[in-house]
Amino acid sequence: MKDNSSWSCSCSWSSWKICLLSVLFLTETITAVKLPPKLIIPAVIAFGDSIVDTGMNNNVKTVVKCDFLPYGINFQSGVATGRFCDGRVPADLLAEELGIKSIVPAYLDPNLKSKDLLTGVSFASGGSGYDPITPKLVAVISLEDQLSYFEEYIEKVKNIVGEARKDFIVANSLFLLVAGSDDIANTYYTLRARPEYDVDSYTTLMSDSASEFVTKLYGYGVRRVAVFGAPPIGCVPSQRTLGGGILRDCADNYNEAAKLFNSKLSPKLDSLRKTLPGIKPIYINIYDPLFDIIQNPANYGFEVSNKGCCGTGAIEVAVLCNKITSSVCPDVSTHVFWDSYHPTEKTYKVLVSLLINKFVNQFV
């Protein structure tokens, strides 16, 4: 039998993604990314929405929660932890790739230990967004309230390791900011809660809010921030159902709004780099790689990209995806999406493998 450890391939530029993923799938053990010399990242800390929520909504009175099966069926021991996924989410996977830990707990996890604080937590809340109205519509934790929890976190870390080490952790950790999808999909288009804004002015509100949030983080001593752009939100299963017509095509207006927001977010972060000494905000283009996975699923080892694995795959998400009313597809690994809104852990792994080296090196 051929030894996969010595397996190699020669790739043309046009096929580099397929080659990379072939190596990923053939390798059974995950090796942490090799950091540049002298680059130390002690913790991963996340803010934002359901993409990096690891359980903050569990004790919040909202319908935007998932601390029940079938969520978590591929998590450790098949436990539903409040992650909007069959398994782990990007915050977990990035922490693992960086050699920090395999699970990033929610800050409000009742089982949280002091040592967990030192290597990172998530403050993110599913359903939140840059628009202050977005979290209010579904009664979840706003970015402003997430920042208040972060203030508590800083004080706790200082009490554990002292002022100097606390400053080091805050300055050198990888901070993730992932939001915008719920603003576009829910607040602006589905609920029409901002009729006074056109798409251009609304995406400006979003990008301004993102810039202001990063500036506030800077005031606490944060220097390394990876800010994720909006995904092709019009192509997620639920938005195909709601806005893609009878054929459930991608909702082009949703995608155009996402691209417009991204086109404003990136230069905003470049501007902060010039005005805030020492900060390193990195724009993460998630739109293009996820869009390519959705449009060409077979290239990445998937079969289904227009429906989720839970229930019909067309609309079930959060409380609608439950073990009483929703069955689960026979093989989660064939699906790009777990429910009608969130990717599977396998999809997240593909995205992380494609993106991590591109931005980690920028923190040197």
UniProtKB/Swiss-Prot annotation:
This protein's record includes keyword Hydrolase: yes
PROSITE patterns with a match to the protein in the record: LIPASE_GDSL_SER
Gene3D superfamilies: SGNH hydrolase (3.40.50.1110)
Enzyme class: hydrolase
InterPro entries found in the cross-reference section: GDSL, GDSL_lipolytic_enzyme, Lipase_GDSL_AS, SGNH_hydro_sf, SGNH_plant_lipase-like
GO cellular component labels: endoplasmic reticulum; extracellular region
Catalytic site: 50 (nucleophile), 339, 342
EC number: 3.1.1.-
GO BP: lipid catabolic process
Signal peptide positions on this chain: 1-32
Main location: secreted
Compartments it resides in: Secreted
Tissue-level expression: Flower buds.
Keywords: Hydrolase, Lipid degradation, Lipid metabolism, Secreted, Signal
MF annotations from Gene Ontology: lipase activity
Family from the record: Belongs to the 'GDSL' lipolytic enzyme family.
Annotated protein name in UniProt: GDSL esterase/lipase EXL3
Species of the source: Arabidopsis thaliana (Mouse-ear cress)
Lineage, broadest ranks: Eukaryota, Viridiplantae, Streptophyta, Embryophyta, Tracheophyta
